[in-house]
Amino acid sequence: MARFFLTHPVESFDKWLPLFDDDKANRTAAGLSDVGVYRKVGDENSLLIVLEGNPDSMKKMLASPELAETMKEAGVLAPPEVFSGEKL
């Protein structure tokens, strides 16, 4: 099991959050679970999303055209930077 730390800017946190919440079923179906969502101190539109699951599932989800469309609709301004890690 790995943890994935994704960062990206959004147009508006208030616009993004409901779409992220609505997409939980897709993350769950992909074998990923939510760990947490964080906003950068001093910049509420710069986000860190932490997920947990299988690295192959994460890669597949990130390549999904459905996710790309959801991110566009949610106002994501750039592709996420992803750090994948395993707890030591």
What are the roles of these predicted feature ranges?
Residues 9-11, 88:
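Short, flexible beta-strand-to-coil junctions
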Residues 30-47, 70-88:
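Glycine-rich beta-strand-turn "strand-cap" elements at beta-sheet edges
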Residues 12-34, 66-71:
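Short amphipathic alpha-helical segments
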Residues 2-9, 36-64:
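Short, well-ordered beta-strand segments in beta-rich or mixed alpha/beta enzyme
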Residues 1-2, 88:
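Absolute protein N-terminus
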